């Protein structure tokens, strides 16, 4: 039996959850098997992220992706035709070489990633395997999920500077049971916010976007909601934050402008300590310092790495070279993994492997501009015992991922998943 090869690569312009254009790619093999992928996009982006190719001009506010689509349908299609879909690394490297830039800016990371993801899906389909099995092998575990239920920063139009307030199930249990707890807290939170006199409109990621005065008020609302839903903060449900500190860091004075205060590195650490003391269920912080504030991040890691999970997002941008540098410097103890920050499946998996090898936890992440694509749900299972954040249990583009995880758990027949506990954080 002849091995199937790539016969055609085709892209089209579709729209994401914020009504912005994005790229959908179909990779068709010589035996008729097809793999499809849809590319997400972010509202808050790190300086070192791979570059999305946008059209500019007046059409669709300059955000059209017809150039990226055309690059897939011409150059990339011609280059990949006849290649082995199972050789993911070779396919991805072919596109990187074809692009010829350090940030995938000529062809567009949105074009390259769409093809990379769709190729993996096509190979899995051709091999009659679910994607998580194709990417991950045999011994698999369900991920621990983090749910953004109060939105601030770049994700909402309110007075909260910290970007995300998340809840996570931490009792060792099935994914379904943990997710049901999250849903209960989410609906309880809506009532708590209404009782506090706040609007309960939703942000980009399905979380509420109340016009609160500060982060402490948001954490109090979460703490109260966990208890009112019948759970114990820090035992059943934990809290995590994406500080996204680059967005309240002022480059001119080198200070953090947070909730009416102007803070240096040490004062910002004191601010975080106050939150950690008041809310011991707060167990994970993402990007607590600016992506270029190496001293601040390293000092905070040294003093807090055994107390909380410190997740690097903008600091590493899912880039193996930047992660290697962060590890050498002693920054963080967990890596956030976003496919479109680096632009290929191969480089994403390399970053995950490097993280694990060096004792860093790994958290797979969605973007604020999402689609119904569930690739990241399968990826989170494939990496075995990782973490996943993909928004609140609301808005279909978020819930699609959680429903996919429910399907996977059913297929695996797993009654229990690996859970993250704060006591596990020790990377000395």
From Swiss-Prot:
GO biological process: glycolytic process
InterPro entries reported in the protein's UniProt record: Enolase (IPR000941), Enolase-like_C_sf (IPR036849), Enolase-like_N (IPR029017), Enolase_C (IPR020810), Enolase_CS (IPR020809), Enolase_N (IPR020811)
Keywords of this entry: Cytoplasm, Glycolysis, Lyase, Magnesium, Metal-binding, Secreted
Enzyme active site: 205, 338
Comment on bound cofactor: Binds a second Mg(2+) ion via substrate during catalysis.
E.C. number: 4.2.1.11
Pathway where it operates: Carbohydrate degradation; glycolysis; pyruvate from D-glyceraldehyde 3-phosphate: step 4/5
SUPFAM superfamilies from the UniProt entry: Enolase C-terminal domain-like, Enolase N-terminal domain-like
Keyword Transcription regulation: no
Binding site for Mg(2+): 242, 286, 313
Binding-site residues for (2R)-2-phosphoglycerate, renumbered to this chain: 163, 338, 367-368, 389
Enzyme class (EC, first level): lyase
GO CC terms in record: cell surface; extracellular region; phosphopyruvate hydratase complex
Cell compartment(s), UniProt: Cytoplasm; Secreted; Cell surface
GO molecular function, one term: phosphopyruvate hydratase activity
Superkingdom field: Bacteria
Cofactor: Mg(2+)
Disulfide cross-links: none
Reactions mediated catalytically: (2R)-2-phosphoglycerate = phosphoenolpyruvate + H2O
Sequence similarity: Belongs to the enolase family.
NCBIfam families (UniProt xref): eno
Function, in words: Catalyzes the reversible conversion of 2-phosphoglycerate (2-PG) into phosphoenolpyruvate (PEP). It is essential for the degradation of carbohydrates via glycolysis.
Protein name, per record: Enolase
Taxonomic classification: Bacteria, Bacillati, Bacillota, Bacilli, Lactobacillales
